[in-house]
């Protein structure tokens, strides 16, 4: 396992639509392990493959209750319900966080790291992680949802970003 460099804006890979993972082989398993290690090292809540420079449809995130990493390969959001105001940050946009609207409940499907079909229904922070990380795969960042510059805030040198918004 290795800690990979996290890409930051304006790196082009963050704005590209990622390609489907064609097969789950040893290189994908290594990528998954590296992404989990990178996410944990950066104290992030989630990470998408484009954030480590790999344009593939693969995300990892940590569920707050268990801190275990969840892996979704070729994820697709199939249902969104409700709305809630959230505060959100991103490892690829360091030093900032924004206030935006996300779904209260999100259902996604994809494959786990072993290629088995899975479905995840998340509420609250898990729904937020599913939306945020899956959007990375289409080149969409949370800042694209901000309605005004007033919703984007800079983190001062003595400020610490709350854990729930480190994505």
From Swiss-Prot:
The answer, when asked if Protein biosynthesis is one of the entry's keywords, is yes
UniProt remark on cofactor binding: Binds 1 Fe(2+) ion.
Q: Which CDD domains match?
A: Pep_deformylase (cd00487)
* Protein residues bound to Fe cation: 90, 132, 136
Quote the InterPro entries the UniProt record gives.
Peptide_deformylase, Peptide_deformylase_sf
Q: Sorted alphabetically, which SUPFAM superfamilies does this protein's record hold? A: Peptide deformylase
Q: Does the keyword Metal-binding apply?
A: yes
Q: Provide the reaction this enzyme catalyses.
A: N-terminal N-formyl-L-methionyl-[peptide] + H2O = N-terminal L-methionyl-[peptide] + formate
The record's section on Pfam families has: Pep_deformylase
Enzyme Commission no: 3.5.1.88
The record's active-site residues are 133
Which sequence ranges form a coiled-coil region, renumbered to this chain?
Answer: none
Look up the domain of life of the source.
Bacteria
Cofactor list: Fe(2+)
GO molecular function, a single term: peptide deformylase activity
Q: Which GO terms describe its biological process?
A: co-translational protein modification; translation
Q: Which UniProt keywords apply?
A: Hydrolase, Iron, Metal-binding, Protein biosynthesis
Main function = Removes the formyl group from the N-terminal Met of newly synthesized proteins. Requires at least a dipeptide for an efficient rate of reaction. N-terminal L-methionine is a prerequisite for activity but the enzyme has broad specificity at other positions.
| Assigned protein family | Belongs to the polypeptide deformylase family.
Query: What is the protein named?
Result: Peptide deformylase
**Which source organism?**
Dehalococcoides mccartyi (strain ATCC BAA-2100 / JCM 16839 / KCTC 5957 / BAV1)
Taxonomic placement: Bacteria, Bacillati, Chloroflexota, Dehalococcoidia, Dehalococcoidales
Gene name for this UniProt entry? def
């Amino acid at each position: 396992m290795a800690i990979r460099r996290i890409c930051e804006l304006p790196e082009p890979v963050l704005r590209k639509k990622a390609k489907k993972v064609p097969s789950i082989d040893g290189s994908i398993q290594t990528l998954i392990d590296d992404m989990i290690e990178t996410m944990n090292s950066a104290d992030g809540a989630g990470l998408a493959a484009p954030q480590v420079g790999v344009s593939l449809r693969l995300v990892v995130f940590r569920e707050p209750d268990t801190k275990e990493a969840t892996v979704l390969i070729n994820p697709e959001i199939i249902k969104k319900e409700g709305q809630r105001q959230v505060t959100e940050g991103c490892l690829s946009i360091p030093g900032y966080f924004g206030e935006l609207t996300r779904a209260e409940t999100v259902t996604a499907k994809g494959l786990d790291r072993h290629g088995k079909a899975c479905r995840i229904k998340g509420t609250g922070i898990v729904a937020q992680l599913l939306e945020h990380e899956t959007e990375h795969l289409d080149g969409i960042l949370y800042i694209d949802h901000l309605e005004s510059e007033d919703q984007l805030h800079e983190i001062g040198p003595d400020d610490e970003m709350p854990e729930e918004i480190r994505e």
